[in-house]
Amino acid sequence: MRLLLCKNWFASPVISPLLYTRSLYSMANTTSFPIAPQAPPNWSFTPSDISGKTNEIINNSNNFYDSMSKVESPSVSNFVEPFMKFENELGPIINQLTFLQHVSSDKEIRDASVNSSMKLDELNIDLSLRHDIFLQFARVWQDVQSKADSVERETFKYVEKSYKDYIHSGLELDEGNRLKIKEIKKKISVNSINFSKNLGEQKEYITFTKEQLEGVPDSILTQFETIKSDKDSNETLYKVTFKYPDIFPVMKLASSAQTRKQAFLADQNKVPENEAILLDTLKLRDELASLLGYDTYANYNLYDKMAEDSTTVMNFLNDLKDKLIPLGRKELQVLQDMKAEDVKKLNQGADPNYYIWDHRYYDNKYLLENFNVDLEKISEYFPLEATITGMLEIYETLFNLKFIETKDSQNKSVWHDDVKQIAVWNMDDPKSPNFVGWIYFDLHPRDGKYGHAANFGLSSSFMIDDTTRSYPVTALVCNFSKSTKDKPSLLKHNEIVTFFHELGHGIHDLVGQNKESRFNGPGSVPWDFVEAPSQMLEFWTWNKNELINLSSHYKTGEKIPESLINSLIKTKHVNGALFTLRQLHFGLFDMKVHTCKDLQNLSICDTWNQLRQDISLISNGGTLSKGYDSFGHIMSDSYSAGYYGYLWAEVFATDMYHTKFAKDPLNAKNGIQYRDIVLARGGLYDINDNLKEFLGREPSKDAFLKELGLQN
């Protein structure tokens, strides 16, 4: 997942040393590299610092806009260039201040960051709806159109996008409607921040006895906090939080169907306070779209996406659903038969029907029994530090980069002791490396931290003047289990996929070469393409040779046996139709609630559960769960009416991989072409043109359909 912190101002985000564990990012001798020309950001903020800097930004921004509104005869030199400079310089500090709510271990700092986000979002809305500035941009837009051939491309695109974003935001409407729009946007912003805060701050858990957790190995049980039962002081209970490293193993390994059901429903029904926030937001979005002349919020939010409108999106999703359902039914029947056989053998009185909370368990059991895939055993060959070092080596080979971990004695350049800070260098000229930027790895869960996996762009690249570049800063935030006294953190294969994916976003952030920050990084491309670069890189995590090279058993240092890897790779598409149907549930729910014309009578709970049962094909067992209360994507300006983008982008990701890398995954020539054509150009050129140049033809969906088993 990609989270962009700073919205454009003109638009509407102890590892114990063990034998055979390589030191993190020690591939190069750091003394052979020059000192980075740009120091990493300083993270030693206090709540007072955050508040003070926020107020300073607000005052400076209002003063700047006031001065720009008074410019007579606005032109590129006296109006546009000052705006670009202002936007470039402001983005990094805003992103720092608002990022801390997701990662700081200090609740006072998180709260200050949330307050900063609310104030800065309100400022952004105020500024984006200033009619006097819109009129200035309208004058400049008219001027640059008349002499387009003599205007630099980035400048032209900047003015064009600014003007069109103003129109999209309703600046051509009368003052009364503009005020209504401003009020609605501010309410939506507050809702989004509170929804996210509730998720980040939740400390909910469910308790089980060891007997109830039968099937969950001791290696997992040791990571759970234990408490004594209120009913029996001699009984130990295990606290299972809803963080991924806790809840997923229970859903996957607990042999008790009742335990799985309780865990599933508790996880799905966490943060109940978010339901009212979501419902209010849906109504506000519908009202906003209506004011702006759109029939639905989906069509309003799709205006700058590749798909362009909700009809195209719904046709794409429904066509895919119809193709996948027959295959999904075949996959499901096998799993249903497995459960029925279990009930017949083990518990005559148990319910033989297959429910949504059974799926992770029987999916895992099927892999184990039919492919001899023991995911826990496989993880022993992928200790976190050694594996990430190996993954970075792949990125180094593909993109001609070098990753060098750096530290400062006072830890002012990181926000937590767990965080790794890495300088990235371009090695196109190995005798004279060029600095690329900074990337952070924040990989373990903790209280108050963002609970999923995401890349946060903290500062996009831009030119300060004709010869000096401000370098990008980006952060990977994940939640991999920490090491224990007995073993290091071990990565499951799906976690390796996750890291590869998020690092793909990070590389997109780092290699941008345009002059203006607005046109660099993932946030500069259409949001239904933004996942494609990362999805493409996931293919390397299914390559036999790359996985063997990555492996290093945490006790012996041995490479993983080929038999284990061969079995794992065979499972790539096992139950793939059911997995994709689950993604379609998210995408179609997102579109359903954002195209509904009668929200007053919409039961969001019934809609969520009925769609899941109909699309995923798996029974809800008569229960109603509220997974939408933790569906963070739907509260994002970018991902709302946009979750379809994961599948849409996968069409391009699969095409790029099979065309350029399937036969030679470490082809550096193709990797550098990809870096320079698809990534480094950002949003300055049409993404379809970039794809056509890189592929040597128009993009095709054939490889995507083959991957899904829908085409020979």
From Swiss-Prot:
Alphabetized InterPro entries for the sequence: MetalloPept_cat_dom_sf, Neurolysin/TOP_dom2, Neurolysin/TOP_N, Pept_M3A_M3B, Pept_M3A_M3B_dom
Residues engaged in binding Zn(2+): 501, 505, 508
Cellular component, GO annotation: cytoplasm; fungal-type vacuole; Golgi apparatus; mitochondrial intermembrane space; mitochondrion
Catalytic activity as recorded in UniProt: Cleavage of Pro-|-Phe and Ala-|-Ala bonds
Gene3D superfamilies per the UniProt record, alphabetical: Collagenase (Catalytic Domain), Endopeptidase. Chain P, domain 1, Neurolysin, domain 3
Any single Pfam family the record assigns to this protein: Peptidase_M3
Location in the cell: Cytoplasm
Details of cofactor binding: Binds 1 zinc ion.
PROSITE patterns: ZINC_PROTEASE (PS00142)
Cofactor(s) in the UniProt record: Zn(2+)
Physiological role: Could be involved in late stage of protein degradation.
Note: Present with 8910 molecules/cell in log phase SD medium.
Family assignment from sequence similarity: Belongs to the peptidase M3 family.
Protein name per the record: Saccharolysin
Organism listed in the record: Saccharomyces cerevisiae (strain ATCC 204508 / S288c) (Baker's yeast)
